Amino acid sequence: MADARTTSVEQRAKDQPRGATGALVFADGRVAWGQGFGAEGAAVGELCFHTAMTGYQEVMTDPSFAKQVVAFTFPHIGNVGTNDDDHEASDPHALGCIVREVVTGASNYRSTSDFADWMGAGGRIGLSGLDTRALTQLVRREGPPTVVIAHMANGEFDLEALRAQAKGWPGLEGMDLAKEVSREQVENWSGGKHVLDLPEGPSTTLGMSGEGDARSQKEPIIPSAVEGPHVVAIDYGAKRNIFRNLVEAGARVTILPATATYDEIVAHAPDGIFLSNGPGDPAATGEYAVPVIRQLLETKLPLFGICLGHQLLALAVGGRTAKMFQGHRGANHPVKRVLDGRVEITSMNHGFAVEREGLPATVRETHVSLFDGSNCGLELTDRPAFSVQYHPEASPGPMDSLYLFEKFVGMMR
């Protein structure tokens, strides 16, 4: 029998190691075995990899990861547990995760749960003991495959059924997921960044929701602006830290569902429009979002888009998007600002990109990936509108690009 601790992605059913309780099943019959943790069951989606060393809780709760299984390239994931503050949404949205080393117990004073227990409570499946380097190389070589991630405590798997499940999944192209992850009701956002009391030493400013235990201060550093510019944000799968940064920049924020109509949006008397990040194929979401965005552009209100919002803005002005071969997901992606050549280290999470070919003359490219030269930002020359493909709010990741929130709020003043 093979060792259950670390297994190859090339193994087949006959190679199941003794004691293996987790399986990653590919449509072509390949199987990677490991130890399951979190929820039991099986889920089908697209395999991707994420290169951040920290921030796994934020990654797992980012709605942009809907219908995806995340393989973390850093070997030690889950060791500090999870807490009640660092969620980017109320629940996990990634289908599951794959880690190299077995998840240990929580070792941070802010932790309220072990990572494995938290995954189980959120109905998400985890696998440990897989060769995550081999998985990453597979995605880079073949593109993101459809997989079924499965955890059975008794080690009994119907591999033919799991393979058929993987083979029958249609993939992310053509899939609108924004409706699935968007909030359904209008929400007035009031939380800014918070002060965290460290055990010994001065307080430190962190991007927290402030919904945790007594060790987190409940009052935001920057209270919700009462007289500041009013941003109406369209939630296609937004991360909470985006709204915290809008508030810190001095804006009042009202959040509307992804399917909000033009009339519903302007009824809130916005000073500016924000288009959020989100999962799925932008062309599919654009079927209902793009006509609304085009109407909003005609108002000449300032408009700012991030990630999916960037792609939707490009579609609204006549551009095209396409699925990337492997996508960009990590917290250390260098991006060049075209205007002055400055390099920003950014956080990214996208599997689709804007094609610069076909963009109209009224669109100026503002940012470019230094990894592959793909488009990472644009602005309109005839409207007060701009967008970026990456995540300036980070969480996790660097804060090189927080100036974009100040730029947006400044355009509304």
State where each predicted segment sits.
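Cysteine-nucleophile active-site neighborhood
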Residues: 271-356, 397-411
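Active-site-proximal beta-strand elements of phosphoester/diester hydrolases
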Residues: 230-235, 346-347, 386-390
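Residue-level structural signal for beta-strand termini and adjacent loop
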Residues: 36-37, 75, 349, 380, ...
